[in-house]
A protein has these predicted regions:
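Glycine-rich, low-complexity segments
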Residues: 2-48, 53, 98-101, 157-165
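Structured beta-strand segments within beta-sheet-rich domains
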Residues: 116-151
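Beta-strand residues in well-ordered beta-sheet regions across diverse protein folds
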Residues: 69-71, 136
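Surface-exposed ligand/attachment interfaces on beta-rich extracellular proteins
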Residues: 9, 35-65, 73-98, 142-153
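Terminal beta-strand-rich extracellular "head" domains
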Residues: 74-130
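Short, ordered beta-strand-loop transition motifs
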Residues: 62-69, 125-130
Length: 165
């Protein structure tokens, strides 16, 4: 019995070691997937907002294993900042799988300097039939007025992960 157990123990150790090595290889492969830049867009259902003369956007994403990981920042600043009108949507870098409509695709924060400066938590879900994500806050859909109108120095920072089409 003892002689028969030793090879099994060695085999079990080898199997465990191989599993750890496979996990390490997968971690290394994930770290090597290059980030791709994309230009995020903040849109509103009725009239699009204007980021202003000093406004800026930036984003990056990666696609691996049928999933998209992404991050984006949108900054309002300078003259000409306008909140637009209607519920806000954020452009996703890659179309999500159609079956995930209304499911979570990201989250982040929305810094609004007026009327009371502060950060608001936002969640994003996949809008029906497209590459847009609806913004949601504790008060409901984020709009040009909810939780407050963006003004100069407002910042939206969001990101997430979702299955792609």
């Amino acid at each position: 019995m003892i002689g028969q157990h030793a090879p099994t123990s060695d085999v079990e150790r080898l199997v465990q070691r191989i599993a750890r090595l496979e996990e390490r290889v997968a971690d290394l492969q994930r770290s090597l997937v290059p980030l791709r830049p994309f230009t995020p867009v903040l849109s509103a259902v009725t009239t699009d907002p204007s980021l202003g003369s000093l406004g800026s956007v930036g984003g990056d994403y990666t696609v691996e294993g049928g999933r998209c990981r992404w991050a984006a920042t949108i900054v309002f600043d300078g003259s000409g900042v306008s909140a637009g009108s209607g519920a806000y949507r954020v452009l996703l870098p890659v179309a999500p799988k159609a079956s995930i409509t209304f499911r979570h695709v990201g989250s982040g924060w929305w810094y609004l300097p007026t009327p009371t400066p502060g950060f608001r938590q936002v969640e994003l879900d996949a809008s029906p039939g497209g590459v847009w994500a609806r913004m949601i806050c504790e008060a409901g859909e984020v709009t040009h007025a909810v939780p407050a109108a963006p003004s100069a120095t407002a910042v939206l920072s969001v990101g997430g992960e979702y299955p792609i089409a």
